Amino acid sequence: MWRIGFDINPSWSSVLSCIDLDKNLASYAGPGHWNDPDMLEVGKGLSADEDRAHFGMWAMLAAPLIAGNDIRSMSATTKAILTNVDVIAVDQDPLGKQATVVATPGTNLEIWSRELSGTNTRAVALFNRSE
């Protein structure tokens, strides 16, 4: 595991910057070697929708899911996001491939796809970059 850039902060622009840095590094990610866009900012001031998008994209990037919030005082919404077993399963898929952008159907929209273990299995995310 290695960091790919700067320290993240709890702002949507910082989350986007981390995603943009990681976007072209898929060939370096895989079992035993992970691109680390930094810890999660979920529950630290982003909106609930931004928190969901942030957590989901870290999973699509096969990034380490390291909670940066105070788990002793997190809200029920934050806990639900951080413990979403389906999203965690995508992140932890044993194939370990990082998602890539496969289409940009609009100014602020990206479609990401990630190959998963199993026959012809993929995770797909529609990522809205807008706030």
Model-based region annotation:
Residues 3, 28, 35, 42, ...:
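Generic hydrophobic/packing signal
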Residues 9-13, 17-21, 68, 87, ...:
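Mature, folded catalytic cores of secreted/periplasmic enzymes
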Residues 58-61, 66-68, 104-131:
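Carbohydrate-binding surface patches
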Residues 1-70:
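Glycan-recognition surfaces
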Residues 5, 22, 36, 84, ...:
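Intrinsically disordered, low-complexity peptide-like regions
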Residues 53-104:
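Catalytic cores of secreted or luminal carbohydrate-active enzymes
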Residues 2, 40, 60, 82, ...:
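Generic structural hydrophobic/aromatic packing signal, biased to beta-strands
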Residues 10-12, 23-27, 41, 73, ...:
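Low-complexity, compositionally biased segments
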